[in-house]
Swiss-Prot record:
Transmembrane segments: none annotated. This is Protein RnfH. NCBIfam families: PRK01777.1. It holds the Pfam family Ub-RnfH. Belongs to the UPF0125 (RnfH) family. It comes from the Bacteria. InterPro entries: Mopterin_synth/thiamin_S_b, RnfH, RnfH_sf.
Amino acid sequence: MEQINIEIAYAYPHNHYLKSFTLDAGTTVQSAILQSGILAQYTDIDLRKNKIGIFARPVKLTDVLKNGDRIEIYRPLLADPKEIRRKRAAQQAARQKGKI
C-alpha cells in the first residue's frame, strides 16, 4: 500500500509538539491523531472541542490526508481578541489624554 508523510503540531506558549509520521494513504485526520499517541501525551486535547486544521485551513476529522500535510491541533482562546483590542485602545487613549 502507498505511504504518505505527515506532521502533527500542537503548541503551547512556551513549548510545542511537532512530529513526523509515515501512514497509509487514505488515512483520515482523526485516525492519524489517534495513531500518533498525542492524546495520551496531552490529555487536555479533546477532539470534540479542539479545532483542527491543515496549514491553517479548518478541516473535519473525516478528511483524508495527503502527502506532506501538517495537522494542527488548536487550543481554545484564553481571551476574546476583540475585548483585548478594546482594552488596549482604551489604555492608549488614556495615555494620550494624560500627555495633553
